[in-house]
Swiss-Prot record:
Its main location: cytoplasm. One of its GO terms (cellular component) is cytosol. SUPFAM superfamilies: Ribonuclease H-like. It comes from Opitutus terrae (strain DSM 11246 / JCM 15787 / PB90-1). One of its GO terms (biological process) is rRNA 5'-end processing. PANTHER family: POLYNUCLEOTIDYL TRANSFERASE, RIBONUCLEASE H-LIKE SUPERFAMILY PROTEIN. Could be a nuclease involved in processing of the 5'-end of pre-16S rRNA. Its EC number is 3.1.-.-. Keywords: Cytoplasm, Hydrolase, Nuclease, Ribosome biogenesis. This is Putative pre-16S rRNA nuclease. One of its GO terms (molecular function) is nuclease activity.
Length: 145
């Protein structure tokens, strides 16, 4: 299993990679200005890494409804299913992952870091790690004898 985590945005696409070891690692975000080039870079990354699973962040509202961003993520997932046939595409609840990722960066650095896509890739890492943790839960400790 080779997974690519995706935090899809209108200006940047955060990426993370993980496998059966169960550890998500951030990759450089896709920050091309042209959305078509960003999309092609996403497809190229998935092909180069020979991923078996794509994990797309699904930004549901706090009341579990799907707003415009969630519907956009659903459309992205559907397009990925079409363009990368044979790759499983999963939508994973990503509520507050961008805020959590941003909280790890000092306030003075956030503007520069946001433009570089670091926050987006950290969010993708959190999304993918959640998926991997569900797939590969840590073993329970052995009972003391």
């Amino acid at each position: 299993m080779r997974c690519l985590g995706i935090d899809y945005g209108t200006r940047r696409i955060g990426l993370a990679y993980g496998d059966e070891l169960g550890v998500a690692t951030p990759l450089p975000a896709l920050v091309e200005a042209d959305p078509a080039k960003r999309w092609q870079s996403l497809l190229a990354t998935a092909r180069q890494r020979r991923v078996t699973d794509l994990v797309v962040g699904h930004p549901l509202n706090m009341d579990d409804t799907a707003g415009p961003k969630a519907k956009e993520a659903e459309a992205v997932a559907a397009r990925l299913r079409t363009e990368l046939a044979g790759v499983d595409v999963h939508l994973v609840d990503e509520r507050l992952t961008s805020y959590e990722a941003e909280a790890t960066i000092s306030k003075t650095q956030r503007r520069a870091v946001r433009a570089s896509g670091v926050i987006d890739s950290r969010a993708a890492t959190l999304i993918l790690q959640d998926f991997l943790d569900q797939r590969f839960p840590p073993p329970l400790p052995h009972p003391a004898e």
